[in-house]
């Protein structure tokens, strides 16, 4: 009797001889129909290739919220950015809020982080089981995931930034809070800034400012894990030299007389001055966008202090190690 081939070998042999059906070869494959392939050098810089838009420079007047009904005023640049709105940058949405006395306004974005600065007025905040008062000059932060009700005891206006556009881009919902609602009272924030401004070497620093922090984010020293909020002063008759960073800055002007301005541009000359800058004249209550990577310097040609509040996505950028903040060196 001739020896039989082992069953396992027979099985492998049959498998090797099996051919793909010609009908299957011509059938569309759903798993690959979205696949694309691009030549590297023409695709590695989509901004340079004009496949994606640059962050536009823009300013927003305080007249947008000076009067009228209780409302949210989105500072919306989504058309220029080519993304769903409202969005002021690719990952952030800045807004003015107006809440008339006796009214309430509900905020419930799909966001991880929300920051408010109280421009004027007073009222209260309620998010889930947490409630606290607010008044002019306060900062406060709110996590996402729960609706927040802002009630005005006196007509209130606020500057409000969240990261909803980032979550829209990521396609994510169901936020898990990384921090609790947190208030930074005006008196404490102003005292912290005053202490920094009175230090002997303050005038030699690139900026005279304090960063709002939260104990949950010791690595980034930022107000939330995504957002950075800075409270800065530009003293009378002073210049704050150029610096740049890869985070977008959504700047709010909390105080300043005519004669205070910012110069913004993409390049420095050999002396550390901005080449062909755009000038932004400050007006109390306005906001403006400083695009990522742009050099910017502040000038105060008046005899009074001026105040600026930049809110950025620098919490996230710092954690990703991509902030790349640089300071001009001038003679």
Predicted regions and their residues:
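Conserved metal-binding segment of the jelly-roll/cupin
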Residues: 133-154, 161-164, 280-302, 311-313
């Amino acid at each position: 009797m001739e020896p039989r081939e082992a069953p396992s070998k027979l099985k492998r042999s049959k498998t090797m001889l099996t051919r793909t059906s010609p009908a299957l070869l011509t059938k569309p494959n759903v798993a690959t129909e979205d696949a694309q392939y691009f030549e590297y050098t023409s695709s590695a810089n989509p901004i340079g290739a004009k496949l994606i838009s640059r962050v536009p420079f823009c300013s927003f007047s305080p007249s947008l919220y000076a009067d009228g009904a209780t409302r949210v005023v989105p500072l919306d640049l989504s058309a220029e950015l080519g993304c769903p709105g409202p969005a002021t940058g690719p990952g952030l949405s800045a807004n003015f809020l107006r809440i008339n006395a006796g009214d309430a306004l509900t905020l419930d974005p799909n966001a991880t982080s929300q920051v408010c600065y109280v421009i004027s007025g007073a009222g209260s905040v309620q998010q889930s089981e947490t409630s606290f008062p607010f008044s002019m000059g306060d900062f406060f932060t709110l996590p996402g995931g729960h609706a927040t009700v802002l009630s005005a005891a006196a007509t209130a206006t606020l500057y409000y930034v969240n990261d909803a556009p980032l979550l829209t881009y990521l396609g994510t919902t169901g936020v898990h809070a990384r921090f609790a609602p947190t208030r930074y009272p005006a008196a404490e924030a102003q005292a912290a800034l005053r202490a920094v401004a009175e230090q002997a070497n303050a005038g030699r620093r690139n900026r005279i400012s304090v960063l709002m922090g939260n104990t949950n984010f010791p690595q980034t020293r930022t107000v939330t894990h995504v957002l950075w909020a800075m409270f800065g002063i530009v003293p009378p008759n002073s210049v704050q030299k150029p610096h740049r960073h890869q985070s977008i800055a959504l700047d709010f002007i909390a105080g300043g007389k005519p004669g205070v301005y910012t110069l913004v541009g993409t390049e420095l000359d050999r002396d550390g001055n901005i080449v062909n800058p755009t000038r932004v004249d400050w007006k109390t209550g306005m906001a403006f966008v400083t695009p990522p990577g742009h050099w910017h310097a502040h000038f105060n040609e008046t005899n009074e202090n001026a105040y600026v509040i930049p809110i950025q996505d620098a919490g996230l950028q710092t954690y990703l190690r991509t902030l790349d903040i640089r300071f001009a060196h001038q003679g």
